[in-house]
Amino acid sequence: MRLRFILCLPLVMLVGCQSVQTTQGGNVGVNRTQYMMGGLSAEEVNQMADEAYQETLAEAKKQGLLNTNAATVRRLNTIAAELIKEVPHFRADASSWDWEVNLIKDDQLNASCAPGGKILFYSGIIDRLELSDDEIAQIMGHEIAHALREHGREAISRAYVTQMGTQLAGALFGLGEAGNQAAQMAVQYGLTLPNSRSNESEADLIGLELAARAGYNPQAAVSLWQKMQTASQGEPPAFMSTHPSSAGRIQALQAAAPQVQPLYEAAK
């Protein structure tokens, strides 16, 4: 009985969620139905994300690390402008978002696009990997795709219903601490991690198409992840990671490149 309930937790966790389609599928065919918590609006998530983004910028500015390289900032803004022109192919309302692009001087290999279009790059990912414009466009397109698909709101919804599901299991069946941990593990492997990995794969594909439509070479996605693979000191198994492995990512991007190559050729 307990095992049956644990295996059914992904269904229990859909209670209180609404099915949505945040984007069009595009040439790459990203059509997964998403589930969002009914009481959590995109506007609320965007506001929370913007507050966190502005706090990050304020701290970087205080330390003298914000937008210190004017040439790189211009480079990022130019690439962003080209990519943003293409977002209506996936989501029409995104063209009116309050987009913002900033650069923090920091050695980490990182970049992000917060919900609502707040793009942030760290200088380390550009300088240490010696990225071309095409490769920057792949990273930026990937991060923009997370925002278009509202993966942040989806993650918050998953976290909420995961907690709700495990608490319900404990309450109904008197599961002790070990039982609750087992339920959490079932939820994690049955719902949370697969969705997280699929989110990353979706962002790869949508980012690939955005960049191609903007005139950036899709083959740069492969060279980018080859550089990331070289820069990594090892990686967790793909099954346990919220990101696909570099090798798996490269293979998927190589398979998808022919779907967007005509878009790139037309945009050149």
Question: At which residue positions do the language-model features occur?
Answer:
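A Zn2+-metalloprotease active-site environment signal
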Residues: R2-R4, C17-K268
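Bacterial N-terminal signal peptides
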Residues: I6-V15
